[in-house]
Amino acid sequence: LIVQDYIRAAREELDVSVGPGRGSAAGSAVAYCLGITQIDPIKYDLLFERFLNPDRISLPDIDVDFDDDGRGRVLNWVTQKYGADNVAHIITYGTMATKLAIKDVARVQKLPLSISNNLCKLIPDKLPEGPDGKVPKMNLNNAIAAIPELREAETSSDPLLRDTIRYAKMLEGNVRNTGVHACGFIICRDNISDWVPVSTAKDKETNEELHCTQYEGRVIEETGLIKMDFLGLKTLSIIKEALENIRMSLGIELNIDEISIEDPATYQLYCDGRTIGTFQFESTGMQKYLRELQPSTFEDLIAMNALYRPGPMQYIPSFIARKHGDEPITYDLPCMEKYLKDTYGITVYQEQVMLLSREIANFTRGESDALRKAMGKKLIEKLNHMYPKFIDGGKANGYDPKVLEKIWNDWRAFASYAFNKSHATCYSWVAYQTAYLKANYPSQYMAGVMSRSLADITTVAKLMDECKSMGISTLGPDINESYLKFSVNHSGDIRFGMGAIKGVGEGAVQQILAEREKNGPYKSVYDLVERVNLSTCNKKSIESLALAGAFDSFGTITREQFVTPGSNGETFLDALVRYGNLYQTDQAENTFSLFGATEAIETTQPEPPKNIERWSDLERLNKERDLIGIYISGHPLDSYRIIIEKVCNMHMDQLEDITPFANQDVMIGGIVTDLRIGQTKTGKPYGIVKMEDYSGAGELALFGDD
């Protein structure tokens, strides 16, 4: 009821988006009826005993996703409702890993940095297998046993080096610092300090002082307190952004929780593999499998979401072949069809193992969950204990012991890969919502995705390419069409947000938007400086807007005219801002005539410089990129596009993995953006060339005569 209360408050009072559920709580019909989750557990065979059963010792927890922006507001609401002394975040303890222990000790010992770095480079990410075939745990003792150079350092005649290794071994694994758990939160009926020791910690984002328990999460449960998880999910923010774009551009109030789960356009998008920008399904490999699978039901999407991960991925080709009838669907026992039909005879979910253990061997609900846990965590002793019960139960139901043994061994092999269906179903529904929006409201959705990706301009560039392939133009910022973030204009094209321009702060954009909303579009740059507060929207902001092309739609003054000095050495931009300040001062200090009428003193509008040298396309594009981080109105390679597409067999974004091009001659075309020249240790020259093409940027190393 506590969880239901803050979820209700999030939706009804705080305008915060809430996810449909996650984890085992989605198997609870009570949680569904209370509105905590939005996935019908009966319809999708989600099991309550994963959430709660008599054999479960620990208290169940309900993890809830909120949109990124709203999570903090929900936590504040909870704090106000229950009292600041009754709630607390959870502390985390950061321990010294192997490399960090060496570095910290080396710094105190004043061991030269080069030697410290060399020691750290000797530490592998993973130790080799031991004589028993097992991979030893990574720690300094095991690393020393496996690596001769570290053994030499441990017994070195240099006391500094020897002591560094000795003290690092002693300090490894000790607590080095504290932090705050990313999502864990405690709500207590009493003052929380009556139950556990409390400290304070600074919130890295808001700089607020937070109450924190001094016990870690795993210890908290032993005190009897319940941990609640408040998670921030970026995808919910994207969906919220898209819904706002739909409302603003089309006037439609769409309820995303009530969309059809059988929308043809959405399934066509999945069948075409056009999932860039959607949740969970956008990787290149997933796109390939979707095109092969041709999903036609929501169950297909749940299964693909569960299968596309290391381990079960090997079953995807068989899953696809069985769906299309290219491989026979077989069941070890006829009764297994009931629970494996939706996944074409392949065990995909942990819940299937639980249901089948009951069906075949009469396991109780609690026992089936214990089996799921034992298989997932490879608890050999527990499995050995449950094996006779499974065989005996199956024999009692008339099944062949050899077939039962095969089923058991198959489960043991696959159970560590099997996925939680409750979680896969919830997240597949969120993924479906994003695909629905992309299929039915493409401009509005892609604008939302780009707004939430501004910190990664490479991702924005890829999303712009995706928009182009969808027939959607991504236009540069415009003073009369742009908002703070990406938006959709009346033609259905996406406009860059003014907040994406370097040098234009959020305060300046809000000032521009508030004035535009109040008194209509700006008619010219003169009209702009006459109306906006020039303390907030200052010269730097106006310059950045001009050079980014936000005033191009006025058509009277070019970008270079703003910043090229005139005959008196002053730029038009300087004169324009001075004019705006004078105009606003005159308006404020208007004089009264004899009859009391208000008359503003006329201020002369400055003229932009004439006959100045126009910027080349490359110069204009480079300034655009400096301010926005990306080429918008064109690309320096546009004149060579046909040649590049005809001649080149490799793109810059493929440099990350050149395995497919082994033993091949490759041709790359692009623009050189940086060049570093140096000498190797042997005195030979080398160069590092940074190049960029339409796909992205990369570096090429050239040596000797290259």
Annotate each language-model stretch with its function.
Residues 210, 215-216, 461-465, 556-706:
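Prokaryote-biased recognition of long, low-complexity C-terminal linker/tail segments
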Residues 1-575, 579-581, 585-587, 594-597, ...:
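Alpha-helical scaffold/interaction cores of sigma-54-like transcription cofactors
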